[in-house]
């Protein structure tokens, strides 16, 4: 069974392909955000490709071109496409068209269900994968404790949280989102607490990777200031184990790959 995968998002397919390639013949058509790469070069790659099943990540031009020149079998929505872009005057029509025309629509985080099912009641939740054999539990904790927050384009760190962490003897590093993916496991292990996003009611992929690494998290689920008061070394160790168990049971890349392989076979059959 030949599967053509078009585009990637947050290294999701990069994480899944190693667990799928023994069963399927996979052609992975990647692109950059450059104008040429995401338009004419992408179109050429799609036209030249040959697959039994076409799987597209993200509901924009990639999916539209696959629908026009091949067959849009799987559309995997990852976030901003159905959360925000779908409402834009310029690109919303493409997202809606792709959702309606794909044979199967998948969504990566639980909060996307309400957005995807407005256009596809049969949309399926396929969890964001985490390579738990790469993001392994940390063994050493810092004294004083250290927290990390990655800057986001759509929200700011809650006002005063950095000061409150400092007063609680927790050092906070605020990082740009330019850490190479292969460096992320060792980067996360330098910290004890991961500060995630608050405006979106789901864990980011980096947060799940931090949880897999045994970090405690401050997230959308928390009142962030009262949450800080709970963060002593013993609680962090306990939460780290709980978080690791959660990711292993719900987001392990091998489990997600098994789910996706069943979906691919069902579409082909």
Please state what every model-predicted region is.
Residues 11, 230-269:
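A charged, aromatic-enriched C-terminal amphipathic alpha-helix characteristic of glycosyltransferases
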Residues 43-48, 88-105:
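Membrane-proximal helix-turn-helix segments that form the acceptor-binding/catalytic region
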Residues 53-55, 69-85, 106:
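Active-site proximal beta-strand in glycosyltransferases
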Residues 56-62:
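Short His-centered aromatic/hydrophobic patch
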Residues 100-136:
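Donor nucleotide-sugar binding/catalytic pocket of nucleotide-sugar-dependent glycosyltransferases
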Residues 131-134, 140-181:
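Conserved catalytic-core segment of nucleotide-activated headgroup transferases in glycan assembly
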Residues 198-199:
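Aromatic "clamp/platform" in nucleotide-sugar-dependent glycosyltransferases that forms part
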Residues 216-219:
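Short hydrophobic beta-strand element within catalytic cores of glycosyltransferases
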């Amino acid at each position: 069974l030949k599967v053509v995968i078009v585009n990637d998002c947050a290294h999701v397919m990069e994480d899944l392909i190693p667990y799928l390639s023994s069963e399927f013949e996979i052609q992975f058509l990647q692109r950059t955000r450059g104008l040429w790469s995401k338009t004419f070069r992408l179109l050429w790659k799609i036209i030249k490709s040959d697959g039994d099943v076409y799987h597209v990540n993200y509901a924009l031009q990639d999916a539209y071109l696959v629908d026009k020149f091949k067959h849009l079998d799987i559309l995997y929505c990852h976030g901003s496409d159905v959360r925000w872009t779908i409402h834009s005057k310029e690109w919303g029509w493409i997202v809606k068209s792709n959702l309606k025309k794909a044979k199967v629509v998948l969504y990566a985080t639980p909060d996307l269900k309400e957005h995807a099912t407005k256009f596809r009641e049969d949309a399926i939740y396929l969890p964001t994968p985490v390579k738990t054999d790469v993001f392994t539990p940390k063994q050493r904790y810092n004294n004083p404790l250290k927290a990390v927050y990655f800057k986001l384009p759509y929200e700011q760190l809650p006002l005063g949280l950095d000061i409150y962490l400092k007063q609680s003897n927790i050092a906070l590093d605020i990082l740009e989102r330019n850490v190479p993916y292969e460096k992320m496991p060792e980067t996360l292990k330098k910290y004890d607490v991961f500060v995630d996003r608050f405006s979106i009611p789901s864990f980011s992929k980096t947060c799940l990777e931090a949880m897999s690494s045994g970090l405690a998290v401050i997230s959308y689920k928390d009142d962030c200031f009262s949450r800080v008061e709970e963060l002593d070394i013993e609680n962090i160790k306990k939460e780290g184990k709980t978080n690791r168990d959660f990711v292993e049971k719900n987001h392990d890349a091998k489990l997600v790959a098994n789910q996706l392989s069943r979906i691919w076979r069902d579409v082909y059959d």
